[in-house]
């Protein structure tokens, strides 16, 4: 097995934080091969044609949640950042709503990279990707073999394969039942939508889960707070490890043993080549990675160091 380089958080956090204090945020619509996608562009002030990072977030989320948090931190360090709403989420309209479909989302990310030439004031030839949580796998698949992308990173990676899925979702039989419910929902006459997160509704996708149920964190007006039951079919059968051995981009995984599924990151590293490295931060939970300042800053510092080494 090819040995993986493990970069320490201290060594990674060498780039000066908050080097560019002022950020300009512009709302735009990208006309892409998958349709119109609502996007926000974060531009560091007084930086001419900066490199650009496409930032994506956790499952069910919109561009104003943790993607915005990381976009702001990247802009403070001299990078432009583009966040966007996937088809059927937030401001990006589609007949299929709130569907967590990995293959659709991978296609959306690829389409955004291919449309960066529509964004003024950036250097689209220096494009990078950053996926947070569930979209880590989507981002890694979207950049594989993609000539529009230089390098990519993932923060709080949710990189599941079949074994991780079975462990998280109650075993093989439970997973099979959820997949079948998803398939039935996809073929039903009406979309089957449930609440995304709640402190009172035990049938919600994420009952009593931090961040998503907190108004000063992820429970914001822009968020759909909804989940299409049909999502189970694609989400639970998606294998983020399937392409690890073929990954051809310089990749950094910013992880912690305290996050949701560290086993998924270890498994991906075991299958990938030396171009995939990891930073392991101490005692950072999944939700801390989303918006706790010291943890977001440490993760951003590591990501920026990685991108700078691949300019």
Give, region by region, the residue ranges found by the protein language model:
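Conserved alpha/beta-hydrolase
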Residues: 73-93
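Alpha/beta-hydrolase-fold enzymes
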Residues: 140-215
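Short beta-strand/loop motif that positions the catalytic acidic residue
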Residues: 247, 253-255
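Catalytic histidine-centered segment of alpha/beta-hydrolase-like enzymes
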Residues: 284-297
């Amino acid at each position: 097995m090819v040995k993986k380089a493990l970069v320490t958080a201290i060594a990674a956090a060498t780039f000066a934080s908050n080097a560019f204090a002022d950020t300009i945020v512009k709302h735009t619509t990208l006309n892409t091969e998958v349709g119109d996608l609502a996007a926000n562009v974060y531009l560091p002030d007084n930086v001419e044609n900066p490199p650009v990072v496409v930032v994506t977030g956790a499952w069910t989320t919109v561009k104003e949640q943790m993607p915005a948090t990381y976009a702001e931190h990247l802009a403070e360090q001299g990078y432009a950042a583009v966040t966007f709403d996937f088809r059927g989420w937030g401001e990006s309209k589609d007949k299929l709503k709130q569907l967590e479909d990995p293959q659709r989302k991978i296609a959306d990310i690829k389409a955004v990279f291919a449309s960066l030439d529509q964004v003024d004031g950036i250097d689209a030839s220096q494009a990078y990707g950053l996926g947070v949580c569930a979209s880590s796998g989507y981002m890694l698949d979207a950049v594989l073999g993609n000539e529009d992308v230089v390098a990519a990173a993932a923060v709080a990676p949710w990189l599941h394969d079949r074994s991780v899925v079975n462990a998280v979702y109650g075993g093989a039989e439970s997973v099979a039942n959820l997949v079948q419910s998803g398939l039935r929902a996809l073929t039903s006459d009406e979309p089957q939508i449930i609440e995304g997160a709640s402190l009172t509704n035990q049938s919600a996708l994420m009952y009593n889960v931090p961040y998503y149920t907190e108004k000063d964190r992820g429970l914001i007006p822009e968020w759909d707070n909804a989940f299409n039951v049909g999502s189970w079919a694609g989400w639970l059968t998606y294998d983020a490890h399937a392409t690890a051995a073929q990954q051809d981009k310089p990749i950094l995984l910013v992880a912690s043993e305290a996050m949701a599924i560290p086993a998924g990151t270890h498994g991906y590293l075991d299958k990938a080549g030396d171009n995939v490295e990891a930073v392991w931060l101490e005692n950072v939970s999944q939700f801390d990675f989303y918006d706790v300042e010291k943890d977001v800053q440490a993760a951003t510092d590591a990501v920026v160091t990685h991108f700078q080494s691949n300019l």
